[in-house]
Amino acid sequence: FWPTCAVSLTATLLSVGLMALIGWYRGHLRVHWHMLPLLALYPVWGVVQQFLIQALVAANLMRDGRGTRSLWPALLASACLFALAHVPNLELMAATFLLGATFTPIYLRWRNLWPLGICHGWAGLFFYFWVQGSDPVRVLLKSFR
């Protein structure tokens, strides 16, 4: 558990730092109370996505027909699937491709989805608010009006 936490949190903090710079440049760098519930809720969806891609796809692609292990097909397939799940948003597709390419080797080494899912959720939260200038809570509340 702890090695996965350390590596995934380091990668996430670096990406959130980059997102903060992008948000500052675009004028989207802000902290809003809507972020608080999403810090708890979005990681749940992150764990589900990590399970679907890492546990079901990447882990199975690590074995070819001869029983040998190959990281590159698993890494590329996982990264591409993460990106395709976010069509048509090109920025989000690029970010999720990089996240998938980063998190796949971490999962395959330590086989722990929890830290990856939590970090996935947190990275997604800051991506929406800071990179895209979007508030998912506000969008959701508007849909109920």
Q: What does each of the following model-derived ranges do?
A:
Residues 7-14, 67-75, 108, 123-131:
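Small-residue-rich segments of transmembrane alpha-helices in multi-pass membrane proteins
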Residues 10, 44, 77-81, 94, ...:
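Hydrophobic residues within alpha-helical transmembrane segments
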Residues 15-20, 24-84:
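Function-critical hydrophobic alpha-helical transmembrane segments in multi-pass membrane proteins
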Residues 51-52, 56, 88, 122, ...:
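Active-site His/Glu-centered metal-binding helix of metallohydrolases
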Residues 68, 90-91:
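Substrate-binding/catalytic groove segments of enzymes
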Residues 91-145:
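Functionally important transmembrane alpha-helices
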